[in-house]
Amino acid sequence: MSALRRKLGDEYQVVSTSASGGGLPPPRAAPRGKRQRFVDKNGRCNVQHGNLGGETSRYLSDLFTTLVDLKWRWNLFIFVLTYTVAWLFMASMWWVIAYMRGDLNKAHDDSYTPCVANVYNFPSAFLFFIETEATIGYGYRYITDKCPEGIILFLFQSILGSIVDAFLIGCMFIKMSQPKKRAETLMFSEHAAISMRDGKLTLMFRVGNLRNSHMVSAQIRCKLLKSRQTPEGEFLPLDQLELDVGFSTGADQLFLVSPLTICHVIDAKSPFYDLSQRTMQTEQFEIVVILEGIVETTGMTCQARTSYTEDEVLWGHRFFPVISLEEGFFKVDYSQFHATFEVPTPPYSVKEQEEMLLMSSPLIAPAVSNSKERNNSVECLDGLDEVGIKLPSKLQKITGRDDFPKKLLRISSTTSEKAYSMGDLPMKLQRISSVPGNSEEKLVSKATKMMSDPMSQSVADLPPKLQKLSGGGRMEGNLPPKLRKMNSDRFT
């Protein structure tokens, strides 16, 4: 622990450990009422189907699946009851044959041949059926060739016994081999955490495999269950949204040999785009995690589920490391599987962080739509001049217009994400700027209109001196070599 603290720093503190306790409890919001979960922590879905009406007959049409889905106590009850009824029914049939033939009468001489030897009451008929069905064959009771009805009943008994054995034993085998118990050795962390990873706000939780046998083709999916109302007024109580845990990159395909931390990057496409530490205290949602894979030993598909409600998501936490390198192998400490520690995390949502970054960056200015926003843009650009962001002296010489209004140049630069110099402005706009009496608002309106026009101008729009210099093209031939290179780079 001390070595880990030296590695991570003293500012990190363990705030949550395994279910056995230890460590400081994670911070909790104000106590709420009991939260109704859609999926329990053990993966059981809290859904009950009612008012089926006549649809219950569909369960009998798929009787085998119905028996497999029953609880164990009902399976055992049906198993014992079916065999008991079958045995009593077949024993009664043998007793009826013996009664109708008169084999139960003991007054027969030695020359009389019964249907079944040594069957003279119901218990003896029941024992004969058990010996035949279980192929015990003691040899004391046996069927004779003088009883054709006994031969037919024997064939019927063999067919019926095979059907009952195949149905009930197969049902019990399928139920015992179901991979539900394999899912109990797949662990999920008790809490999910939200913190920064690789410079991005990320939702994280941990999964682990307690067995040495692998989960083949393990894949994980996440669903966000949240109630919402559509613009048409329809209320959706359990709207399901997909959480991206690496579908495009293949990160959802797991090699689950050691505990893994599953990450969902919160971005503009995430349902948690506007989720902050403050709004999470009032939100109500449930994150359902589904882990699927093929059991290596049986080849059957296994699915493990769990869920995290809003009060089980810790803001500003990170999971404790559980893997250490020993001599020749890696050791996993599952006592720290659920442990988290606090890390510095901004309490704002990703949307709020992007808005603050946009407002704080002077190079990203919105389009000028009204006088208030225009004045704010001009003031922002005035601040840039104060910190020393000016045009290079060579580019100032290119413009050759010292009397051009600086505010107009700034405002025109806000109409596009690309900053233009004086030389990039159209010649009509340059002539307008030199006319006295033009107010700033008129210049702004004309500048906006001119900047929306194509930047390419004809030679007729140039002054006569520039027409002569340009020779029907650009003035690149009269520029110094360095400025000619700069100008060519700008237009490419």
Swiss-Prot record:
Its main location: membrane. It is a multi-pass membrane protein. It comes from the Eukaryota. InterPro entries: Ig_E-set, IRK_C, K_chnl_inward-rec_Kir, K_chnl_inward-rec_Kir3.1, K_chnl_inward-rec_Kir_cyto, Kir_TM. Residues 122-133, 134-140 dip into the membrane without crossing it. It catalyses: K(+)(in) = K(+)(out). One of its GO terms (biological process) is potassium ion import across plasma membrane. A motif (Selectivity filter) lies at residues 135-140. Residues 1-72, 172-492 are cytoplasmic. The chain crosses the membrane at residues 73-97, 150-171. Heteromultimer composed of KCNJ3/GIRK1 and KCNJ5/GIRK4 is activated by phosphatidylinositol 4,5 biphosphate (PtdIns(4,5)P2). It holds the Pfam family IRK_C. SUPFAM superfamilies: E set domains, Voltage-gated potassium channels. Associates with KCNJ5/GIRK4 or KCNJ6/GIRK2 or KCNJ9/GIRK3 to form a G-protein activated heteromultimer pore-forming unit. The resulting inward current is much larger. Inward rectifier potassium channels are characterized by a greater tendency to allow potassium to flow into the cell rather than out of it. Their voltage dependence is regulated by the concentration of extracellular potassium; as external potassium is raised, the voltage range of the channel opening shifts to more positive voltages. The inward rectification is mainly due to the blockage of outward current by internal magnesium. This potassium channel is controlled by G proteins. This receptor plays a crucial role in regulating the heartbeat. This is G protein-activated inward rectifier potassium channel 1. It comes from Gallus gallus (Chicken). The gene is KCNJ3.
